[in-house]
Every structure is written in structure tokens, then in C-alpha cells.
Amino acid sequence: MILKTLAAAAAFACTLSLPAFAAVDAEAAVKLNKDSGCTKCHSVDKAKKGPAYQKTAAKYKGKADGEAKLVDLLTKSPKVKMDDGTEEEHKAAATKDAAQVKNLAQWILAQ
């Protein structure tokens, strides 16, 4: 009995030590993606004028600053190199709400 209690307590303690991740609101991310005009240059699985989101997610996978880099890209409109070699200004997301932009970045990374 004591062993079961200790095992349960240890398992519970381990779950508390895991980082807390909020679930991505996919519906809101897809809406912001569409409203921002992102689908003109990007899709989830096919390269268009810009890279597919799956390629972007793979590029940043496992990198601690991946989400922050995407948030910067979605808010600061930097010059980006297109798949065809040209450069142009990346369009910012159609919101100033940091939580919505972060949700969109997390959705892209989840692809």
C-alpha cells in the first residue's frame, strides 16, 4: 500500500515538473492565417511563393528560439528570401494582439 502511494505521488510530481503548454487554437490560427493573406504565399504542405508550413516547422524544430523567430517574422515585416531567390518584405499578421500572433506561430510549428 505504501509503495503504491509513493509511486502515485512520484508520478504526480513528475507531471508537475513538465513545462506547461497551452493548446494551440487551430481554428483561430487558420482564420488569422487566411485573414492576413498568408495563404497567397504559403500552404501547409506545398511550397508556393513561400515555403510550406511543414518545411518551416522542420526548420525550427527543436530550436529554443524558433517560436520567437516566427513571431518576429509575423510582426516586423522583415525582408525575406523567397524560394525563387527573390527578396521581398514579409507581410505582417493582420493583428497587433501578441497572443493571437503567438498562437499562429505555434500552429505553424505544429504542422
PLM region spans:
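Post-cleavage N-terminal segment of exported redox proteins
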Residues: 1-26, 105-111
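The canonical Cys-X-X-Cys-His
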Residues: 37-44, 104
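Alpha-helix N-cap/helix-initiation sites
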Residues: 46, 63-68
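Axial heme c-ligation environment in periplasmic c-type cytochrome domains
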Residues: 46-60, 73-105
